Amino acid sequence: KLKLHIKKYKYLYNKISKVYNFYINFNIKLKHIFWTRKDIFTDIYLNNKWGDKYSSSGTGSNLNQTRIILKEVANTIKKYEIKNILDIPCGDFYWMKEFDFQVLNYVGADIVSELINENIRKFKRSNINFKTVDLLEDEIPESDLIFCRDCLVHFSFKDIFKAINNIKKTNSKYLMTTNFIERSHNHDIPTGAWRTINLCKPPFNFPKPTLIILENCTEEENQFSDKSLSLWELKNIPEYI
């Protein structure tokens, strides 16, 4: 009986999730008629639409979901002798503020100006800076490592292609970004919604990552346990026409 109840619960949960995602995607498509990309993400931030009580960047940015990567990203930076990092989008800097920046120059960038102004007020130091940057349209600063967590999952295919092409223009050395390594296929969304992506599958076709950090994500009852931060040398990532 317990197994039957669990199966029934999962079935209902998946049905509700599909209806909810349809509503969200439809709502975002309507907004795209009148709103810019900046408007969409500013609205999400100002109204806490990702719904975490600790971080306006969402539940994936609270300390419970980032405890593994705080340690592993630090190890990666040391291993690959990273001296400067561009974190885009940096969000509200909630979990990253726990990082040890003693031997690292950090630039946090985001499309939401209000976020950046708040981060400057709270966290700016001689080696920690923030700036407003549109990942798709603006010139991106060159860095040893471009860190792009929980970003491309919110972009349409078209906007992911634009973002990757813009990142490659920087001649930076490495890209570390969110990757769901066990997903077998990718589906498109309007920018501002969310879904998992596997960058090694079509239509992206990234090569095998140089490094994979499993986040041990427990969100949504461990549905996303394959969530990782994957590292590539930028020169090995394809450009898109």
Feature annotation, model-predicted:
Residues F147:
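A conserved beta-strand element that flanks and buttresses the S-adenosyl-L-methionine
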Residues C151:
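Hydrophobic adenine-recognition pocket in adenosine-nucleotide-binding enzymes
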